[in-house]
From Swiss-Prot:
GN (gene name): pdxJ
HAMAP family reported for this sequence: PdxJ
EC number(s) given by UniProt: 2.6.99.2
Protein name per the record: Pyridoxine 5'-phosphate synthase
Main localization (coarse): cytoplasm
Residues engaged in binding 1-deoxy-D-xylulose 5-phosphate: 46, 51, 106
């Protein structure tokens, strides 16, 4: 089965927030993505609400519950108490925990599972106790996947930023694919499902899914939104679903 596509809405929200106006509609374009076949929607609310606003979460939750109950809501973020309160209020199907500083522009590294296990374990247990699946953001050369499994993670999300950065260097892309494939095999052997995200495009997805056929889900925002400016949301989502099919 091809990996599922979760459309990250942060870039759409950032464009909306350039003006004190309700468009482009985050929920409206999320609806268009789901109608076109996306399996879910992803958001990464940050404390300053510079793109996704806390008020968006209830709207997206209602959209999925009322119109696309087979779809999934994935909320990403650093597990501060404020973040945990948000996810417990809106009950996404999946929570992706990332080690970001709140002021980072975007996620750029995975967890150090060895040093953060004691911090993460009770948080993972708390979220799973509320019925949420937990994914932990991971570097593809992490030495701590065994610890991630012991912490209680259901999935790891492989950070694919370095792979995305090799768009003009085939040799470097091949090296990054080797790292990602090795990491995915290690995670799968431990019983962890494998997600991926960051700088994925219709051009680099086919090679990734060929090397990681067990890939469960990709979360894509920037590249997909950029393509949507040219092709529109429905056509763009269809192109990404085709790319995921290899």
């Amino acid at each position: 089965m091809p990996a599922k596509l979760s459309v990250n809405l942060n870039a759409i929200a950032m464009l909306r927030n350039r003006r004190d106006l309700p468009w482009p509609s985050v929920t409206g374009l999320g609806r268009a993505a789901l109608a076109a076949g996306a399996a879910g929607l992803t958001v990464h609310p940050r404390p300053d609400q510079r793109h996704i606003r806390f008020s968006d979460l209830g709207d997206i939750r209602a959209l999925i519950d009322d119109e696309y109950p087979q779809a999934e809501f994935n909320i990403e973020g650093f597990p501060s108490e404020a973040f945990l309160d948000l996810v417990e209020k809106h009950e996404p199907e999946q929570v992706t925990l990332v080690p970001d500083d709140p002021m980072q522009a975007t996620s750029d590294h995975g967890w150090d599972f060895m040093s953060k296990a004691d911090f993460l374990a009770p948080i993972v247990a708390r979220l799973k106790g509320r019925g949420m699946r937990v994914s932990l953001f991971a570097d593809p050369d992490s030495l701590g996947y065994e610890r991630a499994k012991a912490i209680g993670a259901d999935h790891v999300e492989l950070y694919t930023g370095p792979y995305g950065a090799t768009h003009d260097d085939p040799a470097a892309a091949a090296r990054e694919l080797d790292r990602l494939e090795k990491a995915a095999r290690a995670a799968t052997a431990l019983g962890l499902a494998v997600n991926a995200g960051h700088d994925l495009t219709v051009d680099n997805l086919p090679a990734l899914v060929k090397r990681i056929p067990q890939l469960a889900e990709v979360s894509i925002g920037h590249g997909l939104t950029a393509d949507a400016l040219m092709y529109g949301i429905p056509v763009t989502v269809s192109r990404y679903i085709t790319a995921l099919a290899g």
